Amino acid sequence: MRIHYLLFSFLLVLLSPLSVFTQSINNPVSCVTHGGICWGRCPGSFRQIGTCGLGKVRCCKKK
């Protein structure tokens, strides 16, 4: 029965960093924190990683 607790804690520690990547970027501060810039439309060498909280302003990061 103790192996279940060990397995659960191991999976919790192993999968917890993945929650960082699933959080949405929806404000300018988190955009800059993740290495992006707030731009109206992402230029060719950039990709969209979120929004900057306003309607059509996107958070773009270099590919």
From Swiss-Prot:
One of its GO terms (molecular function) is chemoattractant activity. Disulfide bonds join C31-C59, C38-C52, C42-C60. Has antibacterial activity. It is found in: Secreted. This is Beta-defensin 5. Residues 1-22 form the signal peptide. InterPro entries: Defensin_beta-like. Pfam families: Defensin_beta. Belongs to the beta-defensin family. Gene3D superfamilies: Antimicrobial Peptide, Beta-defensin 2, Chain A. Keywords: Antibiotic, Antimicrobial, Defensin, Disulfide bond, Pyrrolidone carboxylic acid, Secreted, Signal. GO terms for biological process: antifungal innate immune response; antimicrobial humoral immune response mediated by antimicrobial peptide; cell chemotaxis; chemotaxis; defense response to bacterium; defense response to fungus; defense response to Gram-negative bacterium; defense response to Gram-positive bacterium. GO terms for cellular component: extracellular space. The modification Pyrrolidone carboxylic acid is found at Q23. The gene is Defb5.
